[in-house]
Amino acid sequence: MRSHFFLFATLLLLISCKKKNETLFVRLENSKTGLEFRNDLKYTETVNPYTFRNFYNGAGVAVGDLNNDGLPDIFLAGNQTSNRLFLNLGEMRFKDITREVGLDSEGYWTTGVSMADINGDGLLDLYVCKSGPKDGEKRHNELFINQGNLTFLEQSKAYGLAETGLSQHAVFFDYDRDGDLDIYLLSNSGRSIGIYDLRAGQREIRDPEGGNKLFRNDGNRFADVSVEAGIYGSAIGYGLGVTVADLNGDQWPDLYVSNDFFERDYLYLNNQDGSFSEVLPELLPEISMGSMGADIADLDNDTRPDIFVTEMLPATWERIKTKTPFEDWDKYQANVQAGYHHQFNRNTLQRNLGFRPGTPTPIWAE
């Protein structure tokens, strides 16, 4: 009996001495970091979800070393509040320098923001996307060229990048491999959602306000080459995310574009001649319906890029049954035949299985 007691006590001691899980992340209070920022939204008579469909699409953030001191700085975008630029002081402390560097922008409905060395001078510049209601003040994208002393010069018009559409985000990449950065500009259409939209042929009709665009860097100015490059720019492209990666292993950058609502996503393979081929239906068997964003990485360490897409699948069965659209078989097949592909309300992970035998075409399985 006594031996049983000692055995039980030993087991209890071993269990109680189990190694605690290590903490991977610790929340730092903004009172200590100095990162004081809130993107609050307020309804007005002229600006609300009924007058501006993308009211709740949110804003962006960019991180980069703007003054080349080895510390990453943070730019936080605001919709109805001003953008904020925080200078990294070291030891996770930041200083708001927005006004002193001339980047205050309250009321201009900023969406995405990117940091990139646009003019090749070794300094990160800022490209700030704008959206908002049609009568919104100063609704054009802004390009802030870094002057090297934590001051910036707005030169969007000089560079041909003062777009006045419904910009969501911009990604910088060298699609033609000529040594400078080009731009894919993602937009989210302001067009209302309706069942009449599900018909063929709309993808080829360009929309100057809500359509995506590709800009080629020609040195001191950018040229819109969307049409000649084969980039869709219609009103049904409700873009929310764009990702750059070499998807077929030819050492040229390709694109994956996430579209919300009924429009399918786009997968562009680089043709190495300044143009792209949009080939998603041939390569991906099924995709997310209301795609939010995508990321591309080698998830299984087989050296091949996999694609993960997030979706708007509700968290509870009640919302799934009340919010998810259901279609009969004939209507579903008609949508597929009209070019909208096989779409489902859930996240999707496209695993890269390699190449089709004897071809340079990759195979993905969901």
Descriptions of predicted regions:
Residues 17-366:
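Acidic, glycine/proline-rich Ca2+-coordinating loop motifs
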